[in-house]
Structure formats: C-alpha cells, structure tokens
C-alpha cells in the first residue's frame, strides 16, 4: 500500500474507490494499491 498526496491509475485494471472518505486505488497488481492521505 502506497500512501500518496495524489493517487492516479497506473494501468487499465486500476479502479478508484472511496472508503470511509479516503480515495483508494485497487488493482489486480498489488503493487498498484494506493491510498490518499
């Protein structure tokens, strides 16, 4: 999980979701997991 001030999709399989008011990226490739914070 990378925590970044701005999150972006890295590949076509990345999805932007919101959990508990946080923007997150989830993907099949676990290296692409990100959270805004």
Curated annotation (Swiss-Prot):
GO terms for cellular component: cytoplasm; ribonucleoprotein complex; ribosome. InterPro entries: Ribosomal_bL36, Ribosomal_bL36_sp. One of its GO terms (biological process) is translation. The keyword Ribosomal protein applies. Keywords: Ribonucleoprotein, Ribosomal protein. It holds the Pfam family Ribosomal_L36. Belongs to the bacterial ribosomal protein bL36 family. HAMAP family: Ribosomal_bL36. This is Large ribosomal subunit protein bL36B. It comes from Kineococcus radiotolerans (strain ATCC BAA-149 / DSM 14245 / SRS30216).
């Amino acid at each position: 999980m990378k925590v970044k001030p701005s999150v972006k999709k890295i590949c076509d399989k990345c999805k932007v979701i919101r959990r508990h008011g946080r923007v997150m990226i989830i993907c099949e490739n676990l290296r692409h997991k990100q959270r805004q914070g």
